[in-house]
Structure formats: structure tokens, C-alpha cells
């Protein structure tokens, strides 16, 4: 990742050098907190939006696009000014529906870093209908601004007029809000507990079928993923995708996976088979399934 980032941001530029130094200090995680953003903006006389635009090729470098070879980068800006990178993640030899779109990637990245509200989405290509619908699940969706290289400060709902969303199904819960499904993590195996805790934070008001993923890497690091459901159903993002996306955006290698656990309360639906199918194309490590 280090060399790819350096190729994306030519190092004969002082701003690019400063950005690379920040990323190096955090092991190439695709994230800049508010203080880092403010310092870069101050040192190089930029607005946060101009900095985000400059960072889009960098965000896109986290893509995995074995099918389309079309890299999309996105930056979700949290309400306190943190920058969460996102990139499209494709999976060859699996169903195309397993794909993670760049805006989904940035939002789920923010979610797993415990962001509670997105104020702006900066992206290098116009959001597709799938992503517009996914963003409409967010709290305050009507106030989110979309920024493109050729057009800034566009309300999300200008891309999604007469929008369908949670309120149409009498759902008050929104993606990124605090969630609690009363799932108890009291197993002797800590990785199973981490998967249960992730499931407990799932956003699944339509199926009430939470599930979570916990991945253990050979160096002892853990990554978790939560299920993000959508009022339109199909734009929903399974927990395996949110976990893999977080791993990619934090420079984890799938070849270093040691164990993967899914914890699921399968009331109306189950993601077990879908997860097993995707995993079989990525690793020889088998999914450990824990029913809640």
C-alpha cells in the first residue's frame, strides 16, 4: 500500500509529502482525524473541501477492481470534521451483488470508527442510484451535501427527489445511530464475543436479523463488521463486506487471516451461505458460524 500511495501522490509536492507522513504514522489507515485535517489545511492554506478533493485519488487507490478496473474514491466527512476514506471493492469469481460501492465503503468505514453523523460526501464520480439510496438511510440524509470535482454543495435529495426511506416504512432508526439488540457476549472465545458485539450493533430494522463478523489476523489484530440494512433492501451491506472493507482501508492483507467468525440471529433471513460463498473465493480459511 505504501508504494501505491506514493505513486498516487507524487512526492515532489510538499502537501503530498505531508499527507504521506500522516498516513505512515498510522500504518496507512485511510483516515484523517479533525486535528490532522485542520493542520494540513492551515499549513497549506486549504479549505477542508479542497483538501478532500485533493485526497480523492488517494482514496481511490484503496480500491480492488478486478472486474471493472474502474477505481472510485470517496471521502465521508463526519460532523466533527473527520475524514473517512472509501473505495469500491469488487470480488472476482463471485456474484456481482457482493460488490461494495465507494460511498458505502466510506460510510461503513465511518460507522466502524463510531462516527454518528455524516455531513458531506466527496466522491470522484457522480453517485449511482444504489449509493444515493444507501445514503438516504443515514440520519439527517436531507442535509447531506454531495461534492464532485465538477460540482459542489449539492443536497443528496437533489440526486434522489421524492425519496423513499425509513420513514415510509415507519422506521425511526437510522444508519450510524446507536443500536442494541440485547445480544449477550459471554463466550469463552473472545473472537466469538467480538462477532456477537458487532451483531449487536447491526442496523437491521426491517428483518430484525442481526449478524456480525470478527476476523483475526496472524499478528493478533482483529477487525469486525456489522450488518447495515436499507429500506430498499438491495442496497443493504452484509457484515462480511463491512469487515473486509475495513480491512482493506486499514492495509490488512487477506492472506494474513487466521480465523473468521460470524454470529447471527437469523429470524427472517440468514447471510451464512452468502458469506461462505464469498469467502471461498478469497481465502482457504473457513467461516466459523455461531447461531444466536
Curated annotation (Swiss-Prot):
Keyword Hydrolase annotated: yes
Manner of cofactor binding, per the entry note: Binds 1 zinc ion.
Organism: Haemophilus influenzae (strain PittEE)
Subunit structure: Homodimer.
Binding site for substrate: 88-90
Domain CMP/dCMP-type deaminase: 47-167, 186-292
Residues reported in the UniProt entry to bind Zn(2+): 101, 128, 131
Gene Ontology biological process terms, A to Z: cytidine deamination
GO CC terms in record: cytosol
Family: Belongs to the cytidine and deoxycytidylate deaminase family.
NCBIfam families cross-referenced by the UniProt entry: cyt_deam_dimer (TIGR01355), PRK09027.1 (NF006537)
Role description: This enzyme scavenges exogenous and endogenous cytidine and 2'-deoxycytidine for UMP synthesis.
Cofactor list: Zn(2+)
Protein name: Cytidine deaminase
InterPro entries according to UniProt: APOBEC/CMP_deaminase_Zn-bd (IPR016192), CMP_dCMP_dom (IPR002125), Cyd/dCyd_deaminase_Zn-bd (IPR013171), Cyt/Deoxycyt_deaminase (IPR050202), Cyt_deam_dimer (IPR006263), Cytidine_deaminase-like (IPR016193), Cytidine_deaminase_bacteria (IPR020797)
Keywords: Hydrolase, Metal-binding, Zinc
The protein's Enzyme Commission number: 3.5.4.5
Pfam families named among the record's database cross-references: dCMP_cyt_deam_1, dCMP_cyt_deam_2
GO molecular function: cytidine deaminase activity; identical protein binding; zinc ion binding
Active-site residues annotated for this sequence: 103 (proton donor)
Reactions the enzyme catalyzes: cytidine + H2O + H(+) = uridine + NH4(+); 2'-deoxycytidine + H2O + H(+) = 2'-deoxyuridine + NH4(+)
Amino acid at each position: 500500500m505504501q508504494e501505491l500511495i506514493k505513486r498516487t501522490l507524487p512526492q515532489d509536492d510538499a502537501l503530498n509529502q505531508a499527507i504521506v507522513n500522516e498516513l505512515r504514522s498510522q500504518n496507512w489507515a485511510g483516515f484523517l482525524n479533525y486535528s490532522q485535517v485542520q493542520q494540513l489545511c492551515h499549513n497549506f492554506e486549504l479549505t477542508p473541501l479542497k483538501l478532500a478533493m485533493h485526497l480523492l485519488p488517494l482514496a481511490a487507490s484503496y480500491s480492488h477492481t478486478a472486474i471493472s478496473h474502474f477505481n472510485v474514491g470517496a471521502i465521508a466527512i463526519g460532523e466533527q470534521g473527520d475524514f473517512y476514506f472509501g473505495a469500491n471493492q469488487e470480488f472476482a469469481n463471485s456474484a456481482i451483488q457482493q460488490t461494495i460501492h465507494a460511498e458505502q465503503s466510506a460510510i461503513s468505514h465511518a460507522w466502524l470508527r463510531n462516527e454518528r453523523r455524516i455531513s458531506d460526501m466527496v466522491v470522484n464520480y457522480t453517485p449511482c442510484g444504489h449509493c444515493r439510496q444507501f445514503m438516504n438511510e443515514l440520519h439527517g440524509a436531507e442535509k447531506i451535501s454531495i461534492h464532485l470535482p465538477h460540482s459542489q454543495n449539492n443536497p443528496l435529495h437533489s440526486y434522489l427527489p421524492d425519496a423513499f426511506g425509513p420513514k415510509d416504512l415507519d422506521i425511526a432508526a437510522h444508519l450510524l445511530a446507536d443500536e442494541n439488540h440485547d445480544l449477550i457476549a459471554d463466550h469463552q472465545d473472545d473472537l466469538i464475543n467480538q462477532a456477537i458485539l458487532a451483531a449487536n450493533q447491526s442496523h437491521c430494522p426491517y428483518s430484525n436479523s442481526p449478524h456480525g463478523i470478527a476476523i483475526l489476523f496472524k499478528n493478533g489484530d482483529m477487525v469486525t463488521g456489522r450488518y447495515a440494512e436499507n429500506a430498499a433492501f438491495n442496497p443493504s451491506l452484509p457484515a462480511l463486506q463491512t469487515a473486509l472493507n475495513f480491512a482493506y482501508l486499514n492495509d490488512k492483507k487477506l492472506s494474513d487471516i487466521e480465523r473468521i467468525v460470524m454470529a447471527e440471529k437469523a429470524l427472517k433471513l440468514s447471510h451464512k451461505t452468502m458469506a461462505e460463498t464469498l469467502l471461498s473465493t478469497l481465502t482457504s480459511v473457513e467461516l466459523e458460524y455461531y447461531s444466536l
